[in-house]
């Protein structure tokens, strides 16, 4: 049986890892073993943070909406409740964009929410 020489494959594997690790500091971009370990961590972090990014953006949007709503005299909770009662279906991403870039439109939405809250019956304490 013929002998299998793996030099080409091994070199290719090492070169691939070192290319992926270019830009890292010190040994992590120059030594194969350190670069491989760093790449394992990097891939784990990127996988985790792609999922965490969604929650981070939602948190940012809610913070922006809350700040703009409070500037107009409503809390975030009451504002969203009023929008739901009035049947306005605008997501938080768009609301945050309006709060930052179009204050007049956001103020109009606050007035719609305020009117819906005023028209809704107050919940009674049980």
From Swiss-Prot:
Per the UniProt entry, what are the Gene Ontology biological process annotations, in alphabetical order?
ribosomal large subunit assembly; translation
Fetch the SUPFAM superfamilies from UniProt. Ribosomal protein L20 (SSF74731)
UniProt superkingdom: Bacteria
Which Pfam families does the record match to this protein?
Ribosomal_L20 (PF00453)
A single Gene Ontology molecular function, please? structural constituent of ribosome
Keywords tagged on the record = Ribonucleoprotein, Ribosomal protein, RNA-binding, rRNA-binding
Q: Which GO terms describe its cellular component?
A: ribonucleoprotein complex; ribosome
Role noted for this protein: Binds directly to 23S ribosomal RNA and is necessary for the in vitro assembly process of the 50S ribosomal subunit. It is not involved in the protein synthesizing functions of that subunit.
Protein name according to UniProt:
Large ribosomal subunit protein bL20
Say which species the protein is native to. Frankia alni (strain DSM 45986 / CECT 9034 / ACN14a)
């Amino acid at each position: 049986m013929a002998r299998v020489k793996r030099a080409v494959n091994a070199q290719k594997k090492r070169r691939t890892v070192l290319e992926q690790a270019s830009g890292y500091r010190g040994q992590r971009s120059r030594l194969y073993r350190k670069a491989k370990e760093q790449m394992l961590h990097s891939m784990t972090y990127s996988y985790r943070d792609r999922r965490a990014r969604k929650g981070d953006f939602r948190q940012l949007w809610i913070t922006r909406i809350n700040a703009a709503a409070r500037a107009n005299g409503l809390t975030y909770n009451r504002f969203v409740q009023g929008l739901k009662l009035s049947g306005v279906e605008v997501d938080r991403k768009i609301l945050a964009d309006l709060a930052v870039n179009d204050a007049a439109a956001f103020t109009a939405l606050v007035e719609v929410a305020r009117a819906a809250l005023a028209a809704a019956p107050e919940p009674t304490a049980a």
